[in-house]
Amino acid sequence: MIQMNDSKLEVLALGKNIRMSPHKVRKVIDQIRGRSYEEALMLLTFMPYRACDPILKVVCSAAANASHNFGFRKSTLYISEAKVDKGPLFKRFRPRAQGRGFPISKPTCYITIVITSRT
């Protein structure tokens, strides 16, 4: 997806229904917001969190969109906007004592990465 904002071209990539808590993903997203593409790749590769893998896929997808569709060089890209939104809850039941059922909610999240080029 493309956005024109103050004559700057912004390239967007979305990751939907990621089976992870938005709170845990935000912890990693806050570390890469505003950084260059290469620096974000290095951080996401070596951080010890499970949330890094889906974020890395979305960041790589946004960079591939920018380079393939608009001819941007990956060395000039930076993450101008990164956000995590709450997705739908998967509701499950866990069997408990005496025939009861205990509700369990499995959260999901949406990851949005916006990349622009420094010129």
UniProtKB/Swiss-Prot annotation:
Q: Which GO terms describe its biological process?
A: translation
Its domain of life? Eukaryota
Molecular function GO labels: rRNA binding; structural constituent of ribosome
* Record-annotated membrane-spanning stretches: none
Q: Which family does it belong to?
A: Belongs to the universal ribosomal protein uL22 family.
Q: Which HAMAP family match?
A: Ribosomal_uL22_B
Tell me the function of this protein.
Answer: This protein binds specifically to 23S rRNA. The globular domain of the protein is located near the polypeptide exit tunnel on the outside of the subunit, while an extended beta-hairpin is found that lines the wall of the exit tunnel in the center of the 70S ribosome.
Q: What is the official name of this protein in its record? A: Large ribosomal subunit protein uL22c
